């Protein structure tokens, strides 16, 4: 059994606050300076890895003490993770770097049930956490005193421009995509798919040549950026019981391998074709995302095909590197992957707890890391009705998933649910003491699902439109049937 290492960091704030400073995230108007002081308590005889499996950080925010719990994201990389870049003469260079002892964590604030966090501890502490409903960012200060860190609210980062940033998707009817086949070809029944809690997306990210030049040919800087983005993606998708495993990172360091243009739809089409004819033949994966340094026409910052996950040509998205804040890039990539998983743009009736949700068509000044209730339903329908077989298999190597810890609000192997400690659990379907669903649970979501049970037969689940009749639940399924 893996020994869990407990690390306490005391962050002592300096007796002053900064008024304005230029950080990696941009110009920050108000920040606190803190100093990490690390105190390690190791069990006797335990070897000390470079990066511990679990850590705690104690510090003050706005004068109030908080405790940040961190747990290493052991599902970040697949066992066969690889990286590819190209020499100046076009030769492909592929390596399998050791990534088991990495430095990327998920976290939460103690006694704050709604808190989340995504932190890298590679060179100091860098990332974000949510405290009492507000997002804070932390990063090392580039001073002669290497221990100094800045903590600041996301709202205090000066916005780069006032122009809206939007998804380029306009088609929201997945049935219009002819190549997508129905789930009748799947080996699993719809009910087996519904109650198989884990889904695994094996992801490839490609950084184009403009990304390479934008970061001055620094491969390590691009790697770190993408690792941080994928770590945040996992934080966002875990509430859908989806794990994102990075299986390959490709950097077009010599030249672009497709025609990357400012017309987002054309670039998406070219990237999908390249994935099917080139990438898939040398690296097995479920989905590929292109991160590009180009500025797309108009307000578009990303685009993807809808309900296309597992399709060789269509399971792709493209994202513009539009911000210095990696969280915003991750929100955009999560949005495009959401389209791949059957999600459409949110309407005014969609909610995720008072925030602008991930599938909002326009990137908000205060973006959320949560999917809306509409997205949950649309994703559920995709799993039931589309050929989603590829995301039902676990990536290579069971050791990429950490041993389950019931009550940490992270769904892990062997658990059917994890809603936190019993006093904080908000999931009526989940037994917080065992992290198993109650034996009487029939469903978790759907228009004909209420309090974990199928709604009674005859219950109206969709009102009539035009000459149609009301749609009514059957009492045997969580889905609202059509009258056809």
From Swiss-Prot:
Platelet aggregation in inhibited by the metalloproteinase inhibitors EDTA and Batimastat. The hemorrhagic activity is not inhibited by the plasma proteinase inhibitor alpha2-macroglobulin, although the SVMP is able to cleave this plasma inhibitor, generating a 90 kDa product. Its main location: secreted. Residues 199-395 form the Peptidase M12B domain. InterPro entries: Disintegrin_CS (IPR018358), Disintegrin_dom (IPR001762), Disintegrin_dom_sf (IPR036436), MetalloPept_cat_dom_sf (IPR024079), Peptidase_M12B (IPR001590), Peptidase_M12B_N (IPR002870), Reprolysin_adamalysin (IPR034027). One of its GO terms (cellular component) is extracellular region. One of its GO terms (biological process) is proteolysis. Ca(2+) 2 binds at residues 405, 408, 412, 415, 418. Glycans are attached at residues 259, 297, 373. Pfam families: Disintegrin (PF00200), Pep_M12B_propep (PF01562), Reprolysin (PF01421). The keyword Transmembrane helix does not apply. Homodimer. This is Zinc metalloproteinase-disintegrin BlatH1. It comes from Bothriechis lateralis.
């Amino acid at each position: 059994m893996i020994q869990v290492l407990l690390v306490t960091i005391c962050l002592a704030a300096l007796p002053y606050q900064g008024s304005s400073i230029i950080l990696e995230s941009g110009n920050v108007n108000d920040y606190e300076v803190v100093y990490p002081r690390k105190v390690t308590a190791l069990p006797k005889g335990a070897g000390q890895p470079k990066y511990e499996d679990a850590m705690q950080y104690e510090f003050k925010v706005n004068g109030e003490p908080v405790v940040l719990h961190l747990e290493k994201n052991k599902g970040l990389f697949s066992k066969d993770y690889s990286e590819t870049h190209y020499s100046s003469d076009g030769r492909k260079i592929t390596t399998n770097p050791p990534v088991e002892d990495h430095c990327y964590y998920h976290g939460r604030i103690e006694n704050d049930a709604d808190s989340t966090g995504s932190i890298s501890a590679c060179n100091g502490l860098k990332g974000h956490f949510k405290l009492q409903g507000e997002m804070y960012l932390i990063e090392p200060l580039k001073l002669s005193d290497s221990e100094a860190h800045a903590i600041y609210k996301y709202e205090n980062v000066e916005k780069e421009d006032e122009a809206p940033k939007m998804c380029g998707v306009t088609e929201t009817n997945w049935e219009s995509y002819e190549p997508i086949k129905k789930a009748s070809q799947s080996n699993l029944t719809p009910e087996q798919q519904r109650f198989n809690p884990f889904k695994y997306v094996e992801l490839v990210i490609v950084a184009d040549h403009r990304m390479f030049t934008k970061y001055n040919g620094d491969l390590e800087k691009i790697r770190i950026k993408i690792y941080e983005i994928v770590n945040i993606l996992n934080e966002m998708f875990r509430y859908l019981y989806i794990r994102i495993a990075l299986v390959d990172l490709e950097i077009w360091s010599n030249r672009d391998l497709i025609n990357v243009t400012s017309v987002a739809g054309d670039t998406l089409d070219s990237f999908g074709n390249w994935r099917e004819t080139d990438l898939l033949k040398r690296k097995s994966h479920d989905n590929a995302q292109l991160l590009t340094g180009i500025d797309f026409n108009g307000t578009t910052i990303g685009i993807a095909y809808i309900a296309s996950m597992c399709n060789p040509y269509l399971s792709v998205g493209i994202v513009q590197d539009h911000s210095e804040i990696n969280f915003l890039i991750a929100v955009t990539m999560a949005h495009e992957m959401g389209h791949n998983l059957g999600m459409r743009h949110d309407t005014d009736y969609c909610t995720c707890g008072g925030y602008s949700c991930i599938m909002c068509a326009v990137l908000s000044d205060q973006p959320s890391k949560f999917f809306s209730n509409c997205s949950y339903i649309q994703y559920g329908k995709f799993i039931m009705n589309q050929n989603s077989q590829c995301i039902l298999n676990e990536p290579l190597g069971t050791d990429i998933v950490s041993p389950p810890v019931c009550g940490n609000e992270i769904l892990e192997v062997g658990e059917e649910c994890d809603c936190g400690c019993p006093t904080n659990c908000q999931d009526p379907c989940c037994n917080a003491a065992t992290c198993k669903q109650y034996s009487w649970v029939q469903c978790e979501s759907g228009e004909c699902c209420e309090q974990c049970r199928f709604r009674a037969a005859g219950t109206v689940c969709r009102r009539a439109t035009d000459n149609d009749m009301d749609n009514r639940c059957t009492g045997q399924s969580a889905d609202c049937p059509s009258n056809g």
